Amino acid sequence: MSVQTTIKRKTAPDIRARKGGDPIVMLTSYHAHTASLVDRYCDVILVGDSLGNVMHGFETTIPVTLEMMILQGHAVMRGSQHALVVVDMPFGSYEASKEQAFHSAARILKETHCGAVKLEGGVRMAETIAFLTERGIPVMGHIGLTPQSINTLGSFRAQGREEGSWEPIEADARAVADAGAFSVVVEAVAEPLGRKITETIAIPTIGIGASAACDGQVLVLEDMLGLSPRTPKFVKRYGELGPGIEAAIKGYAEEVRSRAFPGPEHVYGMKAKG
């Protein structure tokens, strides 16, 4: 008789229930290996469309495809066991209609086995969020600075810093919550606005350049590890892995060129005749 241990993975309702409780910890991951490390300490792993910047070197997230998100989402699911895995819906996969959004989100859930999707937009996407949640697809919202809107925003700048600019962002937060999202990312907004949104909506807010008062925080893994050449103001670098990785690669290259590697301990001898 075999004994099987069931490992419970966090769900969207688990995260929703954290409103006003212990802060929610979230990081991005795009690979099975990094997912296995992040999974030990985080409640949520976001397979962000930021993979376009981090993995592929795109200037924006606009070129990212649904197929890219599904491939990396599946990898992160294989590498993790405990955290809720949320996969971003890329630009062009959900905006045209509620039906398009459903088909894209259903593909993501079916092909990656993740627990939720994330999409950008507030009031304008509320109907779509409701359509998805009513059909069994958990949705994480995303308001404030929305990177997929770079071509209309003109630049990646913080939102809500001017007098009288709060109301549209507050309306977005209310719309996302009322539509049934289980949580919402609030990106790059004035700190008092991030705090106010957190205090006034019923779902958890996950800040990225918003406020310490948010119900949770998220960063891009490579940014906080010191692997990105440029980091936004809201990023704290918890490591400086870039120089260490470069030193390791340099050491390897030097030893290969000098024939110091591989050494005797790294090669195979003949088996003794028996």
From Swiss-Prot:
PANTHER family: 3-METHYL-2-OXOBUTANOATE HYDROXYMETHYLTRANSFERASE. The active site is at E187 (proton acceptor). Homodecamer; pentamer of dimers. 3-methyl-2-oxobutanoate binds at D49, S50, D88, K118. Its cofactor is Mg(2+). Mg(2+) binds at D49, D88, E120. Keywords: Cytoplasm, Magnesium, Metal-binding, Pantothenate biosynthesis, Transferase. GO terms for biological process: pantothenate biosynthetic process. This is 3-methyl-2-oxobutanoate hydroxymethyltransferase. Belongs to the PanB family. Catalyzes the reversible reaction in which hydroxymethyl group from 5,10-methylenetetrahydrofolate is transferred onto alpha-ketoisovalerate to form ketopantoate. Binds 1 Mg(2+) ion per subunit. The keyword Ion transport does not apply. Its EC number is 2.1.2.11. It is found in: Cytoplasm.
